[in-house]
């Protein structure tokens, strides 16, 4: 494969020197871009877009044509793994993901297969290979998965949830069943991410979107334990280069020390965590990614620039920072504002890397 022309992102994750702070955006390929909407319309629906390697490749590359981003992330969905387990994923207009066959009983968990990344999830691997080929070494490609806990919330609830009633009922009434499910998911995610790495992903990220819904003790037992298992099982070197691993628990700022002890290379931060405090606590062990509130992108260019400057100043000089939003970019943000954000990070961060 082509030699990497811009390795700022990978270097920052490994706390190595860079010339400017690298930047990318969660959900950077998405509905805020008119070209994405056109490609999705061509695909017909969201999962058809994910399953078409050529179209998934196209939307992955779209933000790079607009902005000088330092990384690109595979266009896919965290629910591809449970879908490949046979739960029947579909999307209800205005309501989000739904599963036709949610997990209700222990026997449902026992019957779950562990998907083969090159068979049931082969369309994802094909997309990774196509993207790497089209990138021609421009920037690194990030692969990703949902964390076992986060995937389990959708599988047990049958879709999105705000109260997490069903999975918390399982957690407190049938913890052995939940552990069995999480263990199967961890094994599946290891295979899935290693498949992405073999196909060409140069870094991987675990999205623990709903870990923050747990108590501290439950987080360690039902979420972090399984992310640790995944980190232990991942390929950490491919094609002679280290493959960095980033963990992101939304609402998990109180658990950074425990997360850093998993052996990951970096932690993602949401905007509720002070990045200066995070660096003091774990900056000698891991890089940090984040953490601007995505809603700042509704502001003027001057307001966006001010927030970027504040976060850069809070992190301070030196290595180990990847600038990002604290969660995904909102679908109604003007693309020009995202462009101002990326440019501001590169321009304002130069003085921190002398």
UniProtKB/Swiss-Prot annotation:
Q: Which GO terms describe its molecular function?
A: uroporphyrinogen decarboxylase activity
Name the principal localization, coarsely classed: cytoplasm
Which residues carry the site feature described as Transition state stabilizer? 77
Keywords, alphabetical = Cytoplasm, Decarboxylase, Lyase, Porphyrin biosynthesis
Q: Which family does it belong to?
A: Belongs to the uroporphyrinogen decarboxylase family.
Subunit details: Homodimer.
Q: What is this protein called?
A: Uroporphyrinogen decarboxylase
Organism equals Sodalis glossinidius (strain morsitans)
